[in-house]
Protein backbone atom coordinates (compact mmCIF):
# COMPACT_ATOMS: atom_id res chain seq x y z
CA UNK A 1 0.00 0.00 0.00
CA UNK A 2 1.33 3.43 -0.97
CA UNK A 3 1.32 6.08 1.74
CA UNK A 4 1.41 9.84 1.28
CA UNK A 5 5.08 10.02 2.24
CA UNK A 6 5.97 7.35 -0.38
CA UNK A 7 4.49 9.18 -3.37
CA UNK A 8 6.92 10.21 -6.08
CA UNK A 9 8.27 13.75 -6.02
CA UNK A 10 6.74 14.40 -9.44
CA UNK A 11 3.28 13.37 -8.24
CA UNK A 12 3.57 15.48 -5.09
CA UNK A 13 4.73 18.38 -7.27
CA UNK A 14 1.68 17.94 -9.49
CA UNK A 15 -0.57 17.99 -6.42
CA UNK A 16 1.10 21.19 -5.16
CA UNK A 17 0.75 22.79 -8.59
CA UNK A 18 -3.03 22.43 -8.32
CA UNK A 19 -3.37 23.70 -4.74
CA UNK A 20 -3.93 27.46 -4.38
CA UNK A 21 -1.39 29.16 -2.14
CA UNK A 22 -4.08 30.27 0.29
CA UNK A 23 -5.08 26.62 0.83
CA UNK A 24 -1.57 25.30 1.31
CA UNK A 25 -1.84 25.21 5.12
CA UNK A 26 -4.14 22.19 5.00
CA UNK A 27 -1.78 20.36 2.65
CA UNK A 28 1.28 21.08 4.82
CA UNK A 29 -0.27 19.22 7.75
CA UNK A 30 -0.54 16.00 5.71
CA UNK A 31 2.98 14.68 6.38
CA UNK A 32 6.54 15.84 7.07
CA UNK A 33 7.69 15.37 3.48
CA UNK A 34 4.84 17.49 2.15
CA UNK A 35 5.57 20.16 4.73
CA UNK A 36 9.21 20.31 3.60
CA UNK A 37 8.27 20.45 -0.09
CA UNK A 38 5.74 23.22 0.58
CA UNK A 39 8.46 25.31 2.22
CA UNK A 40 10.61 24.81 -0.89
CA UNK A 41 7.76 26.14 -2.99
CA UNK A 42 7.14 29.14 -0.73
CA UNK A 43 10.67 30.16 0.19
CA UNK A 44 12.67 29.30 -2.92
CA UNK A 45 9.96 29.52 -5.59
CA UNK A 46 10.81 25.94 -6.53
CA UNK A 47 7.74 24.85 -8.41
CA UNK A 48 7.14 21.49 -10.06
CA UNK A 49 5.38 21.55 -13.40
CA UNK A 50 3.00 24.40 -14.11
CA UNK A 51 2.20 25.61 -10.62
CA UNK A 52 -0.37 28.29 -9.96
CA UNK A 53 1.31 29.19 -6.66
CA UNK A 54 3.82 31.45 -8.42
CA UNK A 55 0.96 33.77 -9.32
CA UNK A 56 -0.31 34.20 -5.78
CA UNK A 57 0.81 36.59 -3.06
CA UNK A 58 0.53 36.45 0.72
CA UNK A 59 1.58 39.45 2.78
CA UNK A 60 0.72 41.39 5.90
CA UNK A 61 -0.30 45.01 6.38
CA UNK A 62 -1.20 47.29 9.29
CA UNK A 63 -4.46 49.20 8.92
CA UNK A 64 -5.74 51.37 11.78
CA UNK A 65 -3.30 49.64 14.17
CA UNK A 66 -4.76 46.24 13.23
CA UNK A 67 -2.75 43.45 11.61
CA UNK A 68 -4.33 42.09 8.43
CA UNK A 69 -3.29 39.31 6.08
CA UNK A 70 -3.42 40.20 2.41
CA UNK A 71 -3.98 37.38 -0.08
CA UNK A 72 -3.93 38.19 -3.74
CA UNK A 73 -4.46 35.73 -6.58
CA UNK A 74 -2.73 37.07 -9.70
CA UNK A 75 -4.10 34.41 -12.05
CA UNK A 76 -5.86 36.10 -14.92
CA UNK A 77 -4.14 39.46 -14.44
CA UNK A 78 -2.64 39.22 -17.93
CA UNK A 79 -6.12 38.65 -19.37
CA UNK A 80 -7.34 41.95 -17.89
CA UNK A 81 -9.53 40.03 -15.46
CA UNK A 82 -10.35 41.69 -12.16
CA UNK A 83 -8.00 40.52 -9.42
CA UNK A 84 -9.92 40.34 -6.14
CA UNK A 85 -7.69 40.74 -3.08
CA UNK A 86 -8.65 39.11 0.20
CA UNK A 87 -7.96 41.23 3.29
CA UNK A 88 -8.56 39.52 6.62
CA UNK A 89 -8.01 41.03 10.06
CA UNK A 90 -5.99 38.88 12.46
CA UNK A 91 -7.97 39.15 15.68
CA UNK A 92 -5.42 37.54 17.98
CA UNK A 93 -3.76 40.91 18.70
CA UNK A 94 -6.84 43.12 18.89
CA UNK A 95 -6.02 44.33 22.39
CA UNK A 96 -2.63 45.72 21.24
CA UNK A 97 -1.96 48.88 19.25
CA UNK A 98 0.37 47.55 16.53
CA UNK A 99 2.60 50.18 14.90
CA UNK A 100 4.73 48.07 12.58
CA UNK A 101 5.09 44.50 11.30
CA UNK A 102 7.91 42.51 9.75
CA UNK A 103 7.63 39.18 7.95
CA UNK A 104 10.68 36.98 7.45
CA UNK A 105 11.27 33.22 7.05
CA UNK A 106 7.82 32.22 8.18
CA UNK A 107 7.61 34.46 11.26
CA UNK A 108 5.52 37.58 11.72
CA UNK A 109 7.00 40.17 14.10
CA UNK A 110 4.52 42.72 15.46
CA UNK A 111 5.78 45.88 17.15
CA UNK A 112 3.65 47.86 19.56
CA UNK A 113 4.74 51.47 19.97
CA UNK A 114 4.97 52.83 23.48
CA UNK A 115 6.07 56.23 24.73
CA UNK A 116 9.90 56.38 24.92
CA UNK A 117 11.33 56.59 28.43
CA UNK A 118 13.56 59.51 27.51
CA UNK A 119 12.43 62.75 25.90
CA UNK A 120 15.72 62.76 23.98
CA UNK A 121 14.94 59.51 22.20
CA UNK A 122 15.86 60.14 18.52
CA UNK A 123 15.34 56.70 16.95
CA UNK A 124 11.75 57.18 15.80
CA UNK A 125 12.45 56.90 12.04
CA UNK A 126 15.52 54.71 12.41
CA UNK A 127 13.96 51.76 14.22
CA UNK A 128 15.74 48.44 13.79
CA UNK A 129 14.60 45.01 14.89
CA UNK A 130 16.08 41.54 14.60
CA UNK A 131 14.86 38.05 15.36
CA UNK A 132 16.20 34.57 14.92
CA UNK A 133 16.94 31.36 16.80
CA UNK A 134 19.81 29.81 18.71
CA UNK A 135 21.51 27.07 16.66
CA UNK A 136 23.67 25.88 19.57
CA UNK A 137 20.86 24.29 21.55
CA UNK A 138 21.14 20.52 21.96
CA UNK A 139 17.53 19.98 20.92
CA UNK A 140 16.44 23.05 18.96
CA UNK A 141 12.87 24.10 19.64
CA UNK A 142 11.23 25.51 16.52
CA UNK A 143 9.07 27.77 18.68
CA UNK A 144 12.01 29.34 20.55
CA UNK A 145 12.80 32.75 19.14
CA UNK A 146 15.37 35.30 20.29
CA UNK A 147 14.33 38.93 19.91
CA UNK A 148 16.45 42.06 20.08
CA UNK A 149 15.73 45.73 19.63
CA UNK A 150 17.65 49.01 19.81
CA UNK A 151 14.88 50.97 21.50
CA UNK A 152 12.36 50.60 24.30
CA UNK A 153 9.49 48.85 22.57
CA UNK A 154 7.26 45.90 23.14
CA UNK A 155 7.89 43.21 20.58
CA UNK A 156 5.77 40.22 19.79
CA UNK A 157 6.29 37.12 17.73
CA UNK A 158 2.75 36.46 16.65
CA UNK A 159 2.79 33.22 14.68
CA UNK A 160 4.24 31.24 11.88
CA UNK A 161 2.10 31.58 8.74
CA UNK A 162 -0.63 28.97 8.41
CA UNK A 163 -0.11 27.80 12.00
CA UNK A 164 -1.09 29.75 15.12
CA UNK A 165 1.48 28.05 17.30
CA UNK A 166 3.18 30.89 19.18
CA UNK A 167 1.72 33.86 21.02
CA UNK A 168 4.49 35.51 23.02
CA UNK A 169 4.62 39.10 24.21
CA UNK A 170 7.55 40.47 26.13
CA UNK A 171 8.90 43.86 27.11
CA UNK A 172 12.54 44.49 26.32
Curated annotation (Swiss-Prot):
Q: Which residues form the F-box domain?
A: 1-51
* One Pfam family here: F-box
Domain of life of the source: Eukaryota
For this protein, the record's InterPro entries field holds: F-box-like_dom_sf, F-box_dom
Q: What is this protein called?
A: Putative F-box protein At3g13825
Q: Which organism is it from?
A: Arabidopsis thaliana
Amino acid sequence: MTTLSNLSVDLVGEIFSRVPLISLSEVRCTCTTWNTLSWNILSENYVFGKADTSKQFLGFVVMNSKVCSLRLDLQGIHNNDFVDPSLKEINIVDQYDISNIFHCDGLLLCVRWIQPRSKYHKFHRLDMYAFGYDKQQQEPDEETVTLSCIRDEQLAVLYQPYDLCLDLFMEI
